Amino acid sequence: DNANGSVEVTTNALGDEIVKMLKQSSDFANHLASESSKLQSAVQNLTSSSNSQAASLEETAAALEEITSSMQNVSVKTSDVITQSEEIKNVTGIIGDIADQINLLALNAAIEAARAGEHGRGFAVVADEVRKLAERTQKSLSEIEANTNLLVQSINDMAESIKEQTAGITQINESVAQIDQTTKDNVEIANESAIISSTVSDIANNILE
């Protein structure tokens, strides 16, 4: 009887331990399943936000590309304007040479008219008017050249500014591309985490079963 009693006590104790272990396993499995569910939810949110961020970054990159393209077009136009300004300066130079020659001819005509005395008085008046016209032409040409120089300088400054801005936008675009790639990498990591979380959840459910 004592032996039977001892076996019964031992069996009961072992049964209690088994029940206790099963309860602990069940509690652990429930906790594991709960945490896995939370992890899956967090991963889904991360994936969704990462995809949205990636889409926004791609839109930003596209907009920056358009801005860069527009700036490059403006830079080309400014180069064209500078070329045309140089052509204007060349033309004003030619006109200036002609005005110098006219002024010299008017001076010679005035000298000849003075030598002619009374007979050359009318011619002298015409020569003086021609000289004044040549002087006004020279003055206007000087103003045109000065304004053209200012225009060219302003365009050069603008072109340099556009160049710097384009370089800055290019750097920003490169940074956006890097962030976009990092975001895509995060999405891949999140997807892998979701797979792991699902596997853990399955294990927890198997324990509960």
Please provide the spans of the model-predicted regions.
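HAMP domain helices
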Residues: 1-56, 140, 147, 209
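Parallel, heptad-repeat alpha-helical coiled-coil signal-transduction segments
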Residues: 13-19, 51, 64-76, 80-104, ...
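Short alpha-helical "patches" and their helix-cap loops
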Residues: 24, 80-81, 194
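Core structural elements
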Residues: 35, 172-173
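Extended, amphipathic, non-transmembrane alpha-helical segments
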Residues: 38-40, 103-106
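Short, charged, amphipathic alpha-helical segments
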Residues: 57-61, 173, 194
